[in-house]
Regions:
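Bacterial N-terminal signal peptides that target proteins for export
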Residues: 3-15
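Bacterial N-terminal signal peptides
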Residues: 15-24
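Extracytoplasmic copper-binding redox domains, predominantly the cupredoxin/blue-copper superfamily
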Residues: 25-117
Length: 117
């Protein structure tokens, strides 16, 4: 009987820890690379995230890059990223489609879209 009581106490403790971790996990974070594999691209160039999620843009190669969101200056990162590994994060608080581009390389097709649900 005592073994059984100890088992249930341990299970209760484990389930409490798991529930705490489940609800304490921060919003999902995704990553988009700028200049992937030596190309003037965002990789991926299309991404779907949830409201409250963050996306980190990482300068991979071929600087300089920036990220400008059409109609959303508050999300844009106008400063040019020159160093490989340089990054910045954008958090999306409203659902919608967010088109973005690298201004220096938009003519080369360096554009993308983030769908926020």
């Amino acid at each position: 009987m005592r073994t059984r009581l100890l088992f249930f106490k341990q299970m209760k403790f484990i389930l409490t820890i798991l529930a705490t971790l489940l609800f304490a996990v921060p919003a999902w974070a995704a990553e988009i690379q700028m200049g992937k594999d030596g190309m003037l691209v965002f990789a991926p160039c299309e991404l779907t995230v949830s409201v409250g999620d963050s996306v980190t843009f990482v300068n991979n190669e071929l600087p300089p890059h920036n990220v400008m969101f059409a109609g959303h200056d508050e999300l844009s990162h106008n400063d040019l990223a020159f160093s490989p590994g340089e990054s910045f994060e954008v958090t999306f608080h409203e659902a919608g489609d967010y088109n973005f581009q690298c201004d220096p390389h938009a003519g080369a097709g360096m554009k993308g879209v983030i769908h926020v649900q």
